[in-house]
């Protein structure tokens, strides 16, 4: 409905151009918002106040002109002027009911789909040769929820898991594997459970032994030169590490696959050309033997130019180099209209610099959008970054195990007579969903406190509350299996019916905002408000015990669309629903 009002206003602006009220080349930025007070209508715009200067008229006079020139619409019951020139729109109840009936019979819930784009989404991207830890959670699940919503809206989404599968740490790991095999023979194999221990032991050897460090550096050079032996060992590390990553993805319900992996090593052959092209464009400078690019817009607090280091004095490449190669690939080969990067907020300056440089060097098309969607940190209840009791990094699998165990205790306490298999399955869904939703429901850019007690609560904006809300709505239909809804129509008579209907109609605009801002918490907030609106409706408006069959059918349709919307919304967040809790 919001997009319909925007369309009416766009047509009105065109009419103003034809009448000479505004210049023919005038570009209006039309903004329509939901009203907080329903006595002021359902939707409102400040367009009249925005046009005051260009039209040379006072806002209330312009507001009346806008109303007089609005195309006729059966969706609008009335339009009023308020205050200094706000225009309030009251939506027709019958039009709203028709919109919801259409949503019930459409896989896209009656949402007008945008012009499809090709969108590259870079997310998760852990460093290999280590197990995933809690620091990987936010990028992985925030990115995945945005990906799901973009695909639902009809975009072509290309997932890119830009794993850290290259670099000096691999020389250290290869050297340690050599030592192990020299001592234990070729049968020395890496196991997934050994990966973290292996990495720490290799790092200790690197720090303590000059000879070992020298050998590690030699192996890096050999690996970068395409040495077959080194490449075989490197591939072994990557396979073990990726196997672990995808076990975690499967457990989290994340949609990334092996086919989405396009790590740093994929751009090795392009790095030298990146340097040559920057040099040919006259962008490279030398600083202490390193090849760098200075951009006027980036300076230190003291006013000194801030470089982007492209190649170190020893010939090595950096993250900026591979990021530039990746951006060129995503623009020229993948033909992306938009590229979204879900990386820690602490990398903001890095991305500002490389995005600017990619445009300056024409590595990406001028019209391609590059977006760093940064996020804050997940902290413990002491307000500090989440750690183990000993101060170590928390493995993601350990966090999920703990969530599962706590969820199992919770579900068992509420259902002491439930069979073990059902308890286990419900606990699995509740545990994983609680971890994901606790993160996704927070503003992406904020730090947040991780609390098992809060996330497993059945009160407030939590996964257990929403999962229960869904089962409550879906449960109505287990008692209504014999009711035929073929000829049922939605009729909005009670205030709580209208409030629920209005909230249901906002699903599409919520997804538009969520994908535009890359903010899953917008969808979480919407689903929480929808569950609340249904609860108020259910208390005030008997469904199965309605006064008439027509009223019963109408309310069942509202309940059905609520269940469908909750189910789809949670699915877009990567959260499974349950039919029983």
Swiss-Prot record:
Enzyme Commission (EC) number: 6.1.1.19
Residue ranges of the motif 'HIGH' region: 126-136
Catalytic activity: tRNA(Arg) + L-arginine + ATP = L-arginyl-tRNA(Arg) + AMP + diphosphate
GO process terms (BP): arginyl-tRNA aminoacylation
SMART domains according to UniProt: Arg_tRNA_synt_N, DALR_1
Entry annotated with the keyword ATP-binding: yes
Plastid keyword on record: no
Keyword entries, A-Z: Aminoacyl-tRNA synthetase, ATP-binding, Cytoplasm, Ligase, Nucleotide-binding, Protein biosynthesis
Gene Ontology CC entries for this record: cytoplasm
Subunit details: Monomer.
Classification via NCBIfam families: argS
Name the record gives this protein: Arginine--tRNA ligase
């Amino acid at each position: 409905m919001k997009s319909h009002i925007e369309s009416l206003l766009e047509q009105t602006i065109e009419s103003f151009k034809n009448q000479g009220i505004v210049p023919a080349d005038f570009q209006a930025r039309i903004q329509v918002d939901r009203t907080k007070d329903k006595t002021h209508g359902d939707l409102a715009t400040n367009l009249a106040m925005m046009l005051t200067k260009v039209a040379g008229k006072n806002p209330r006079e312009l507001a009346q002109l806008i109303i007089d020139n609005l195309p006729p619409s059966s969706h609008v019951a009335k339009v009023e002027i308020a205050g200094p020139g706000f225009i309030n729109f009251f939506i027709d109840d019958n039009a709203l009911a028709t919109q919801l009936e259409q949503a019930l019979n459409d896989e896209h819930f009656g949402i007008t789909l945008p012009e499809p784009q090709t969108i590259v989404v870079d997310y998760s991207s852990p460093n290999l040769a280590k197990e995933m830890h809690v620091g990987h959670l936010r990028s992985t699940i925030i990115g995945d929820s945005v990906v799901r919503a973009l695909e639902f809206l009809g975009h072509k989404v290309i997932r890119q898991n830009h794993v850290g599968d290259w670099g000096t740490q691999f020389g250290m790991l290869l050297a340690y594997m050599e030592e192990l095999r020299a001592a234990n023979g070729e049968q020395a194999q890496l196991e997934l459970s050994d990966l973290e221990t292996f990495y720490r032991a290799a790092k200790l050897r690197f720090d303590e032994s000059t000879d070992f460090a020298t050998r590690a550096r030699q192996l890096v050079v050999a690996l970068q030169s395409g040495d077959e032996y080194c490449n075989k060992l490197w591939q072994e590390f990557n396979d073990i590490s990726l196997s672990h990553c995808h076990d975690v993805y499967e457990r989290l319900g994340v949609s990334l696959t092996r086919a989405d992996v396009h790590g740093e090593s994929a751009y090795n052959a392009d790095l030298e050309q990146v340097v040559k092209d920057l040099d040919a464009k006259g962008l490279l400078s030398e600083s202490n033997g390193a090849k760098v690019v200075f951009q006027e817009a980036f300076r230190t607090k003291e006013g000194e130019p801030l470089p982007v280091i492209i190649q170190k004095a020893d010939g090595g490449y950096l993250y900026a180099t591979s990021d530039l190669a990746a951006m060129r690939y995503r623009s020229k080969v993948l033909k992306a209209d938009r590229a979204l990067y879900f990386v820690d907020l602490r990398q903001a300056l890095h991305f500002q610099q490389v995005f600017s440089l990619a445009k300056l060097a024409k590595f990406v098309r001028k019209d391609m959008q590059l977006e760093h969607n940064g996020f804050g940190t997940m902290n413990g209840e002491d307000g500090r970054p989440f750690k183990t009791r000993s101060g170590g990094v928390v493995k993601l699998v350990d966090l999920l195990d703990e969530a599962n165990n706590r969820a199992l205790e919770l579900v068992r306490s509420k259902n002491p007579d439930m069979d073990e298999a059902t308890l286990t399955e419900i606990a699995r869904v509740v545990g994983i969903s609680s971890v994901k939703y606790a993160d996704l429901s927070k503003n992406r850019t904020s730090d947040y406190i991780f609390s098992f007690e809060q996330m497993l609560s059945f009160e407030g904006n939590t996964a257990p509350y929403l999962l229960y809300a869904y089962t409550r709505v879906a449960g109505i239909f287990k008692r209504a299996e014999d009711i035929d809804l073929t000829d049922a129509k939605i009729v909005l008579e009670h205030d709580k019916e209208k409030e629920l209907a209005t909230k249901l109609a906002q699903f599409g605009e919520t997804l538009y905002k969520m994908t535009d801002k890359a903010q899953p918490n917008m969808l979480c907030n919407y689903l929480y408000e929808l569950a609340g609106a249904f609860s108020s409706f259910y208390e005030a408006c008997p469904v199965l015990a309605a006064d008439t069959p027509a009223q019963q059918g109408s309310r069942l349709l509202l309940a059905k669309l609520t269940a469908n919307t909750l189910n789809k919304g949670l699915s877009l967040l990567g959260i499974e629903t349950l039919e029983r809790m």
